[in-house]
């Protein structure tokens, strides 16, 4: 099916290094990422041509997706009507594939290849059978023109788990296989020999070929006989960073769905079908492998100096005795406490989390829930828990508003095993941030007895009513503006939200509909408020002024400042006949931000100035939305304005004077110099292009609608969680990869694989340990990726910048025994995992390990050029 492609030709067709599009592969050249990826595409095509199957098993973060897309694109160049199906773990990852294909088409492909694939349209399919958005529907759409029509469908592996009707649950395994066989037959009826190529991302999902799950049964029915006429595709391309995810037999189990491998050892199968290279990152001192910069830490928790947590634990122990008496249970009784209980109201336990590995209940769950909620009702706060405590101390910056605070250290990724833990961690971290925000607001408003007010307000759970009656600036609470039609936040009615940032939201159904905080943000958004231009870019995107605004012939209608300045930027003129000039030209804060960038960061200034006006306009919408809805900067701005009002600089009779005075006051106080606003401005510019192209899927150079960044409006909490019950996970991925919220993301295994979370984060916490080294590596791989924060730090600062991996545990408990046993065995298995050759991982817990288990924590190895030996090279 493929033309004859050599390595040089592939490097000419696909530009794997966008900074050097003239780069060409030559024999004997120095090892580089682009050379590795060219070799990968070539090696995969050779294996597909020879064996009809290839396994791309490169280490996490090496660009398996773009290599697979390279293979697919060359297939379409060779056979323009090729039919291709991609199976990925979930629809979020399917969307990432679509984004990456558009990147390849518009950026990586040379003119010839771009022309050859211009007709390809990636289609996200809900599942195989959906009448409106199913794979079968798309196949039937082209059945009358198969010779000319190509096909590129993407759907989720999870769709194989939902084929059994409710009335057939008693015989679900047989029914799942039967339903999948029907799908196979319907595909074969139209496509005859099936798809030209099926690509399976995270192929280790199919490592349990002999398992008794619906997914396994459905997979056997869908994929057909490995060597028979029912085979779903002519060729299969499998992707996984952990081919021996749990043990070495996983290799043949995965391949066994598509090829008869019974006569081969796992090692022989890897030699024949696999490409596996180990990742390296070019940095300040040379090429690093992961052991040069990974730094593992333990976070030891205990009851010392925390009598409240010890008291709660004693009450918990007493409740266990009262409930179970002397009956067994042993260490299983401790799982709920050690993994973390939930002190807020529980959600439904019947939720799809993608795997049995994320469990909801332990033996002690109900006891913990009752005790913790009683505690919460009594003391208005969650009961102390030492393991939660050490995590909170590490993830919540006490110096958030200090001049020396570095926001690039605010991102933290946390993995748990129990589903309630993600909500509890989120609730506690948001509560800690609320204390920081509340103190900042009280300092700005300077009410009498603010220390006493702080405690009273906290006891009222940061009540809107208490804030309005006892704290907020009475002279500045009401604005005569129309209300913005705000969509409610992700967690608008949730008890785990940030209650302080909730003050900035208009609550149409609340008895306290508006607050001084919501009125302030309303000023910065509503077009009829002059302050809505405060965070807009300058007229020339540098330091330019604005001269006029729109009015209405109807005196009952309000002026429109925002539309006027946006029209001016777009058309270099205003578009209404009803124009009034400002009393004097007005600037925005953008001018001061630009001047400070010019004075402090010449390289980043070059980046910003290299952008077209279209890109700068897109960036301005992104930046303003993030600042107002998904960052602590809204608190900073509110505090500035409150101090400005208290200083009696606000002119309530002339808004233009008030606006100019506010800008002058900020300038004279030199507030921008060390502000969060400026820090976020710098951080947002630094990663904007990567966020657009790699995460969001927006064209960096084309006009986009102002609401393109509306997902950020739903992220006004510092912490959030990802589990099966969270529907829109894409916005969490966007937010976490931006400088904006969430700063802390807690996740079950649903974010363990295939999700890119690397642009802003270099810290991962295993609150609940992974079950295997393979799963542990997948978790770390969410942030240990090329071109992310870890890689940027290696380029800038070298080996010492590091990737930090944390393991919290409760000292002198079963928790310590679990962790010690895992760490000792993990190190031996990591080397075997690198080579794809480990034997069974022993999950048993050794209770005899001494304190020297800490020596097994990974510390950065002394640097020398990594010299990785690839276990299964491409050529």
What are these regions (language model features)?
Residues 1-47, 52-740, 748-760, 797-875:
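Helicase motor interdomain insertion/brace
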Residues 767-770:
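Short beta->alpha connector loops at strand-helix junctions that form conserved
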Residues 772-795:
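Conserved SF2 helicase motif VI
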Residues 743:
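Glycine/proline-rich, flexible active-site/cofactor-binding loop segments
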């Amino acid at each position: 099916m493929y033309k004859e492609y050599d390595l040089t030709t592939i490097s000419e067709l696909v530009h794997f290094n966008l900074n050097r599009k003239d780069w060409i592969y030559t024999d004997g050249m120095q090892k580089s990422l682009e050379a590795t990826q060219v070799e990968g595409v070539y090696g995969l095509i050779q294996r597909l041509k020879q064996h009809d199957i290839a396994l791309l098993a490169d280490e996490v973060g090496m660009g398996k997706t773009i290599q697979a897309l390279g293979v697919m694109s060359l297939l379409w160049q060779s056979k323009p009507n090729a039919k291709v199906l991609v199976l990925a773990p979930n629809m979020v990852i399917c969307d990432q594939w679509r984004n990456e294909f558009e990147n390849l088409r518009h950026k990586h492909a040379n003119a010839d290849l771009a022309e050859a694939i211009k007709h390809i349209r990636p289609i996200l399919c809900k599942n195989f059978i959906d009448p409106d958005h199913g794979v079968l529907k798309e196949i039937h759409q082209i059945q009358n023109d198969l010779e000319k029509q190509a096909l590129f469908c993407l759907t989720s592996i999870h769709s194989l788990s939902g084929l059994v009707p409710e009335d057939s649950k008693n015989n679900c395994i047989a029914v799942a296989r039967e339903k999948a066989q029907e799908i196979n037959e319907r595909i074969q009826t139209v496509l005859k020999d099936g798809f030209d190529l099926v690509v399976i991302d995270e192929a280790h999902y199919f490592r349990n070929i002999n398992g008794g799950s619906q997914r396994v049964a459905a997979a056997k029915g869908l994929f057909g006989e490995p060597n028979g006429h029912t085979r779903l595709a002519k060729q299969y391309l499998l992707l996984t960073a952990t081919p021996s995810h749990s043990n070495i037999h996983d290799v043949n189990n995965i391949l066994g769905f598509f090829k008869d491998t019974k006569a081969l050892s796992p090692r022989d199968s890897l030699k024949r079908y696999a490409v596996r290279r180990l990742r390296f990152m070019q940095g300040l001192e040379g090429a690093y492998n992961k052991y040069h910069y990974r730094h593992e830490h333990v976070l030891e928790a205990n009851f010392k100096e925390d009598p409240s947590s010890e008291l709660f634990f004693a009450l918990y122990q007493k409740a266990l005795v009262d409930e179970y008496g002397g009956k067994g249970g042993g260490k299983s009784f401790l799982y709920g406490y050690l993994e973390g209980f939930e002190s807020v109201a529980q959600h439904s336990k019947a939720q799809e989390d993608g795997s049995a590995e994320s469990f909801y209940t332990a033996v002690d769950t109900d006891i913990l829930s009752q005790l913790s909620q009683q505690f919460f009702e009594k003391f208005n706060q969650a009961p102390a828990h030492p393991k939660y405590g050490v995590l909170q101390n590490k993830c919540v910056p006490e110096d958030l508003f200090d001049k020396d605070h570095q926001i690039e250290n605010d991102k933290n990724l946390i993995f748990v095993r129990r589903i309630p833990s993600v909500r509890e961690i989120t609730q506690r971290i948001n509560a800690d941030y609320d204390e920081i925000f509340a103190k900042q607001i009280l300092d700005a408003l300077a009410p009498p007895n603010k220390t006493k007010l702080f405690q009273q307000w906290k006891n009222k759970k940061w009540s809107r009513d208490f804030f309005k009656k006892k704290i907020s600036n009475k002279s500045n609470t009401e604005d005569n503006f129309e209300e913005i039609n705000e969509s409610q936040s992700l967690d608008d009615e949730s008890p785990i939200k940030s209650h302080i940032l909730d003050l900035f939201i208009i609550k149409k159904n609340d008895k306290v509909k508006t607050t001084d905080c919501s009125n302030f943000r309303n000023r910065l958004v509503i077009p009829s408020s002059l302050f809505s231009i405060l965070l807009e870019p300058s007229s020339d995107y540098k330091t330019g002024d604005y001269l006029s605004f729109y009015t209405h012939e109807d005196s009952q209608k309000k002026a429109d400042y925002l539309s006027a300045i946006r029209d001016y930027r777009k058309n270099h003129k205003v578009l209404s006949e009803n124009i009034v000039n400002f009393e004097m030209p007005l600037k925005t804060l953008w001018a001061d931000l630009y001047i400070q960038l010019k004075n402090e960061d010449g390289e980043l200034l070059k980046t910003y100035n290299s952008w077209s006006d279209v890109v700068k306009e897109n960036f301005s919408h992104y930046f303003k939305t993030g600042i107002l809805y998904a960052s602590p900067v809204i608190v900073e701005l509110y505090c500035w304005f409150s101090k400005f009002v208290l200083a009696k600089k606000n002119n309530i009779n002339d808004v233009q004077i008030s606006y100019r005075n506010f800008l002058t006051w900020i300038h004279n106080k030199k507030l921008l110099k060390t502000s969060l606003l400026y820090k976020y401005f710098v951080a947002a510019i630094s990663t904007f292009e990567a966020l657009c192209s790699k995460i969001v899927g927006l064209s960096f150079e084309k006009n986009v609608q102002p609401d393109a960044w509306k997902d950020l409006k739903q992220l006004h909490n510092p912490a959030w969680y990802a589990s099966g019950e969270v529907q829109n996970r894409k916005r969490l991925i966007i937010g976490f990869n931006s400088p904006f919220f969430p700063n802390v993301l807690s996740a079950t295994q649903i974010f363990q694989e295939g999700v890119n979370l690397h642009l802003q984060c270099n810290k991962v916490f295993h609150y609940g340990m992974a079950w295997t080294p393979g799963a542990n590596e997948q978790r770390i791989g969410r942030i240990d990726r090329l071109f992310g924060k870890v890689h940027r730090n290696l380029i800038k600062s070298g080996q010492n910048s590091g990737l930090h991996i944390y393991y919290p545990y409760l000292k002198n408990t079963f928790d310590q025994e679990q962790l010690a046993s895992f760490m000792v065995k993990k190190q031996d298995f990591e080397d075997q995992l690198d080579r794809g050759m480990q034997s069974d991982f022993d999950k048993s817990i050794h209770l005899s390990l001494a304190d020297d288990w800490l020596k097994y924590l990974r510390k950065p190895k002394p640097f020398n050029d990594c010299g990785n030996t690839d276990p299964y090279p491409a050529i």
